[in-house]
């Protein structure tokens, strides 16, 4: 029948094979057709046989295979031969291919597999629970020790039964007794392979390694009544455990194996206090008196109310007391506004400035002062103590805001104090000493027919002719509107011409040291009433060998009005008094960029208790100048590179090119003309008329490029210089600083390009340090790694000490 055929197809499953060692062989790999669903489990009942009315199924290729012949068992069964490597590889390949193919399972099949898996898990848990119950020995029946069962027979039988049960089941061996956490007391006759596994943890471990570590560390399962009773008995007979470590391996494992950081937070992590009405509602403490806290009223209404109550209570003295209360409240409000820290110094009035505000003000302008009784700097021209007519002249000239050195030096100079100003080049030093000078001589009697022959009231010394003439031009802007006369005495002009200019007398004389000494020795000029001396670029004068000339000039001054070297020299009122109704104490000012020992010696000899004003850092370049250094070897390559820079159109004229040798000036200027640019030269071999004409052509814009030596490196002010090119690197870092200071003046920006070669090794270290200090400059890699830039050169140190000591000099390049 069809039904019998269907049943035979189900029951025709071959019996499991048995290996020679009695174990069933490994199951065969899955069929290649992975889309065929797995056979139903044996636990499910087979479907009912089809009715006899239906025709038998047609024969097809899917008919079940015929039953295999039964194999012989026992000693007569043929022994299976060893598998060949080809068969093993073939089976493995087929298994891998079958596992790699996707298997389609319907929803019903997936549910059936899940039910089977769940049923197996439940059966496994039930079997383990029964095994644990069978293996557990009740407390008090420990066998073989005389305090359990009546004799050791019970323990032996139980152990024998457990051994038989374990051989029949898949038993997992356990570790030694010390690792079982005292769960039960086993008989001493148990073998190592009879120990049961440790109980499962209530909380499953994340990994197998973590589970094993937790078991070894002694993770305890949930305690029950039997475990507690066993623990009490163990404590009673064996004593309490001592020196028990509180180290938690679980916590350590969680801390060290935590690799994923959780960026979220839970509500349990919130440690802020909950809502508390005590902290939400602030208590207002009403105190005695007219106000609340500390007895002060919070508003004006309460103060007025209190004052009115005083008047009503005491008719005679109450009104006076009420007025005092109101006035005290007004002063308190003013003090609160004056002492407020939220306002910048620029928003406060002068009388509201505190010491903290002045400290911030000095830091903003990089001002540092040294000396006693130094006044605060001025914030603007209107807050200075300059006379009204001089302020009008300043406004006409176009000085909107004072520079840093003017803010600090002018208030000190107006107190008749001796002053040493250390400032970078291009910082406005000329106006810083000219304005106090004009205020000083305006208080002296004007020159007449008799007093004009006694000499000037003030002299200004400059190291070079160009700087002296530049100071003269600047001084005439302020002195001429006030009615004062300024005359310059420099070399290059005839002595008769300068004597003619002095025929009507002059309040201010600007001169170079060499020519001024000639005039004094030839009796062209006397200093009988000179009481104001200014030395500009004092360090440069010493370098040029004018120390002896400076000493002669200062020794020729009258000594009747010399300041005392006492504390009175710091008293502004005492130093402002007139001596004998006409003369005043002599006032000496010195401005320099560096302070070599020779300059310090002059200052100590001729200045009395001077105030020292420093702007910026000594010897550093202006922060507005971008310094670029290029390694270019050879004259031809440098000329080619100079042509590229000038032809780029990046820099607008005027442009200054510095060289070290006079004969190179004319050669470089000639090459620049061949490039298509106009150029003039400036060096010591030029006559005074040629120097003045060259500077005038550059300042007027008629000439594009000025080629000069270090003669034009200091004090020469050519407005709007956009580029300075050091065709040859300066011989020392001080000259380099003054060279690049020709650009970036008056707060404007500029660029300085320096051509460097191996012959400049003596200055590489200082140049690298200067570039590193600049925030807008970059040190080239070749200079950073150069051997000469790693340490300061020691060459020429002895000669430098002799020059600084005043025993020699470099000659009078800019002298008379």
Curated annotation (Swiss-Prot):
Per the Swiss-Prot or TrEMBL annotation, the motif DEAD box is positioned at 536-539
- Stretches of Low complexity bias are at 202-217
Per the Swiss-Prot or TrEMBL record, what residue ranges does the short sequence motif Q motif cover?
379-407
Subunit comment for this entry?
Component of the U5 snRNP complex.
Signal peptide (residue range): none
Q: Which PANTHER family match?
A: ATP-DEPENDENT RNA HELICASE DBP3
What is the role of this chain? Answer: ATP-dependent RNA helicase involved in mRNA splicing. May destabilize the U1/5' splice site duplex to permit an effective competition for the 5' splice site by the U6 snRNA, resulting in the switch between U1 and U6 at the 5' splice site. May also act to unwind the U4/U6 base-pairing interaction in the U4/U6/U5 snRNP, facilitating the first covalent step of splicing.
Some GO term, biological process aspect, for this entry: which one?
A: mRNA splicing, via spliceosome
Q: Which UniProt keywords apply?
A: ATP-binding, Cytoplasm, Helicase, Hydrolase, mRNA processing, mRNA splicing, Nucleotide-binding, Nucleus
What is the protein's given name? Pre-mRNA-splicing ATP-dependent RNA helicase prp28
**Gly residues bias (residue ranges):** 805-816
For bias kind Pro residues, which ranges apply?
Answer: 24-67
> Per the record, where are the segments of Basic and acidic residues compositional bias?
87-100, 118-135, 154-169
- What EC designation does it have? 3.6.4.13
Q: Where does ATP bind?
A: 423-430
Which species? Sclerotinia sclerotiorum (strain ATCC 18683 / 1980 / Ss-1) (White mold)
Q: What is catalysed by this protein?
A: ATP + H2O = ADP + phosphate + H(+)
Q: Which family does it belong to?
A: Belongs to the DEAD box helicase family. DDX23/PRP28 subfamily.
Q: Looking at the record, which segments are called Disordered? A: 1-106, 118-227, 781-816
All residue ranges annotated as the Helicase C-terminal domain in the record: 624-787
Q: Where in the cell is it found?
A: Cytoplasm; Nucleus
Output one GO MF annotation.
ATP binding
Domain comment, as recorded:
The Q motif is unique to and characteristic of the DEAD box family of RNA helicases and controls ATP binding and hydrolysis.
Pfam family name, one: DEAD
